[in-house]
């Protein structure tokens, strides 16, 4: 479903969970326009809805104490839980050093905050600070078959060029950890990209298996929230590949920490083609089509209008427009990144407070799960 299709006004509690790996020290433009854009829209929708309901209650309740009590319930009705999933990073074939992983975790938190994630409205924490994620993963691993995990598309893709002896059990059970992340908070909705939809289907399957094995219906079956982004953001050097933090070519992506000059240089060096004119044709002209998508997303101008405006203009003129459009989006984020980098204690405190809130929910649910399974605690 799309974000606008989520009924935040329904009486049923909505809990949204999503996470991002700290595989790099900075998010890129694709992250910002894709997953982060989704998160920000959800944050705005939930905040607006909670505020409207609170105002209605304040009008209808004559007792201030009663109103205060009801407002607390409203604020707890919809939960937004966003995590830096550092445990998932350990499954990467290109492992980060301990210092890199810790540094990246703080850097990604800074990027979240700079993009607009508000810790007053969202539970923001890093995954490894909530031990219940690992405990639930083990429980779910015990009801998941090897054949189901080994047939997951991403596992096959990541291991097809690897020696079997070098493939870790962590990579195999990656979907189980992801399922635990989601089910631990009884998430009802999860915003994901196209490449993660099978993992969400797996999460629903594992919830069903848990209910069947233990004769208990504890977990909701989470719904997938698909991206509102009209076009995927691809590599600046290959319009057929997704823009990625792990791409060894730095010029393939725009990082949120890039200076104006770096952005201009990367766009100047971005791959196009020899065909005259700026037209949108993802099949035959993937590179220029990708640049048009980025221009549309960052400027708010429809691709059809951009084609009309630049159809007879050179690539250089179009790239100048694109650079300025990206800079307009990124420069205020970069300023906020600099602010949080100068205040590391503030960032650590935000993660600590977020982990305390997450632990409270996670431990409560895990204890119920242990009772269902028969684990003494």
UniProtKB/Swiss-Prot annotation:
GO terms for cellular component: mitochondrial matrix; mitochondrion. ATP binds at residues 21, 28-31, 193-195, 242-246. The keyword Transit peptide applies. One of its GO terms (biological process) is tryptophanyl-tRNA aminoacylation. Its main location: mitochondrion. It comes from the Eukaryota. Gene3D superfamilies: HUPs, Tyrosyl-Transfer RNA Synthetase. Keywords: Aminoacyl-tRNA synthetase, ATP-binding, Ligase, Mitochondrion, Nucleotide-binding, Protein biosynthesis, Transit peptide. Its EC number is 6.1.1.2. GO terms for molecular function: ATP binding; tryptophan-tRNA ligase activity. It is found in: Mitochondrion matrix. The keyword Cell membrane does not apply. A motif ('KMSKS' region) lies at residues 242-246. It catalyses: tRNA(Trp) + L-tryptophan + ATP = L-tryptophyl-tRNA(Trp) + AMP + diphosphate + H(+). A motif ('HIGH' region) lies at residues 22-31. L-tryptophan binds at residue 181. Signal peptide: none annotated. It holds the Pfam family tRNA-synt_1b. Belongs to the class-I aminoacyl-tRNA synthetase family. This is Tryptophan--tRNA ligase, mitochondrial.
